């Protein structure tokens, strides 16, 4: 429920923020297109991460959490792509991003693990994954967007925070 509310707020902010022309890339500023492209990349990576547990988790709650995470990010990616299309923005996800590194690390950490060892590791990685995206969004991304995109970045943080809180509940089971 919390994730759905955060997701709706985030999508709402994206839907109602004014359409912006592409900004020149100076002083590390992200244009609307670059911001949406970054978020699209992060959604794809998060879906790939979630699918690791969808296919390999032994615990039903872990599988369900992974399915919910994949679905939430899939829905968000689709909405983001529709908004970009409506605004005539061409998304070009960055080649490398924090989420790319996180995905590589997760695959490496989960390699060879099965059963409870896999589940426990994935849940901890999921919590760390979301925490890292929240911190990066707050410290790096928000510092690089103009005031007109701050609501989008803030709603994205809130949306991720709700997912993190849900994952934290599951994490307690594996302590």
Which residue stretches match the model-derived regions?
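His/Met- and acidic-residue-enriched segments that coordinate or traffic transition-metal cofactors
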Residues: 18-175
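Bacterial N-terminal signal peptides
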Residues: 4-16
């Amino acid at each position: 429920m919390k994730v759905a509310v955060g997701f709706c707020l985030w999508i709402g902010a994206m839907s109602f923020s004014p359409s912006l022309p592409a900004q020149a890339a100076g002083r590390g500023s992200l244009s609307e297109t670059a911001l949406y492209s970054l978020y699209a990349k992060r959604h794809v990576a998060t879906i790939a991460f979630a699918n690791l547990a969808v296919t390999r988790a032994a615990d039903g709650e872990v599988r369900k959490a992974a399915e919910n995470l994949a679905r939430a990010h899939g829905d968000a990616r689709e909405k983001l792509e529709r908004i970009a299309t409506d605004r005539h923005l061409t998304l070009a996800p960055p080649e490398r991003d924090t989420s790319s590194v996180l995905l590589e690390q997760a695959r490496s950490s989960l390699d060879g693990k099965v059963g409870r060892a896999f589940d426990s590791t994935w849940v901890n990685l999921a919590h760390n994954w979301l925490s890292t995206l929240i911190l990066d969004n707050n410290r790096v991304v928000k510092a690089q967007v103009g005031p007109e995109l701050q609501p989008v970045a803030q709603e994205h943080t809130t949306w991720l925070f709700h997912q993190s809180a849900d994952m934290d509940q599951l994490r307690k089971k594996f302590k």
